[in-house]
Swiss-Prot record:
One of its GO terms (biological process) is cysteinyl-tRNA aminoacylation. HAMAP family: Cys_tRNA_synth (MF_00041). The lineage of its organism: Bacteria, Pseudomonadati, Pseudomonadota, Gammaproteobacteria, Enterobacterales. NCBIfam families: cysS. The gene is cysS. It comes from Buchnera aphidicola subsp. Acyrthosiphon pisum (strain APS). A motif ('KMSKS' region) lies at residues 266-270. Its EC number is 6.1.1.16. InterPro entries: Cys-tRNA-ligase, Cys-tRNA-synt_Ia_DALR, Cys-tRNA/MSH_ligase, Rossmann-like_a/b/a_fold, tRNA-synt_1_cat_dom, tRNAsynth_Ia_anticodon-bd. It is found in: Cytoplasm. This is Cysteine--tRNA ligase. GO terms for molecular function: ATP binding; cysteine-tRNA ligase activity; zinc ion binding. Binds 1 zinc ion per subunit.
Amino acid sequence: MLKIFNTLTSTKEIFTPIKKNRVNLYVCGVTVYDFCHIGHGRTFVVFDMIVRYLRFSGFQVKYVRNITDIDDKIISKSTKEKKKINTFTASMIKEMHKDFDLLGISVPDEEPRVTDYIDNIIRIITTLIKKKHAYIHKNGDVIFSIDSDPNYGTLSRQSLTSLESGSRIPLNNMKKNPLDFILWKSSNKEEYSWDSPWGKGRPGWHIECSAITNVFFNNSIDIHGGGSDLLFPHHENERSQSICFNNKSMINFWMHTGMVILNNKKMSKSLGNVYFLRNILKDCDAEVLRYFFLSTHYRHPIYYCEKNLDQAYTSLKYLYTALYDTNPFFNNEEGLNFELEFYNAMNDDFNTPAVFSIFFKIARKINFLKNKDILKTNKFAFRLKYLANNLGFLFQDPKEFLQKKTTLNLLTLKEIQLLIEKRNIARQSKLWQEADNIRKKLMSLDIILEDLPDKTIWRKNKKS
């Protein structure tokens, strides 16, 4: 019996699909103004895992993940690069797919682009105006009135009063309430606008998802997902306008992934600590990064550092070492007790850390049986590979994986050597504090120095 944590109720609930054995799943996708970063990777690996498991469990899943291909950031970036928007977004979408393919993220059943659904967006906005949930400013902007929805704030568990009192958004002559948000943004630039009853313009961010879910699911959604950074205001606004349009909510479960933490700070472009997936994957095996993403429960923050990537590599190395020199392609009933444990862990809100511990138990069994009973060894190897494959793991040839360069180095070998040389120069100049600071910096990255009579050598600290 599958239980999923529902953000709306803040409880784990038994998952019962709206239609038996069918799951409608929608995830907010990427705004394609730049390359995908580690936060995108974490969220979409998580929902890829969820889709894989639901299908493994016998559900027919319709998975839709949108692409936002028009907004202010896209306009700014395409203008800066002197490219037409369609050309720019097409290239960014292509790069997104490259990154996701490397991580083993399956292509959704549908990947709608916002600009293909402008008519649907206009239709919903028109209805919201008629129902007095939205108003038109004289400049052509259409704005949603949060005061028209008495349940606004329910998803993020915030009252309208507290939101208004805590708002730092200055009241302007456009909005009746500082928290009101744009449904349609007026624009006279031909390339960036569409005709509407209110004049030329383009859609606001929040209305896009409401329109797309209406088209593909008629707002009948079992699971709606995204990163926790989208909970407020994006998902709150999306939920509010969708309910006001339909007169009811047809989203059963809201799911949110935890933030990526870098140096004890959440990842943010404003903080300048964004790590692009493609840069990480230059030095890190993609399966190691995927394992890292799922080594922490999806709802919890995940701490990105070299040490944790090393741990992910070490874990995968153990599993591949167990599979090495086995023939895991013989379907059998050996190890079904482990499969039951696997189901129990996954049915507990997709508890992947518990699943990984089950994989280790099977691997230990394989290692124990090696050189004792090759037939049983292969049977348990099949069970390990079968279960892991269904979450996107252990597809590589064990020998090839074990021979690869293993994990991300935040410092390259050349950079490490340059720091050691800089430290040696400082020591020769008796700049002891500078030399010690370099040593401490390397230690913080689990690099241990050893000073010999004629040189300094280094090694990774594998005990940490």
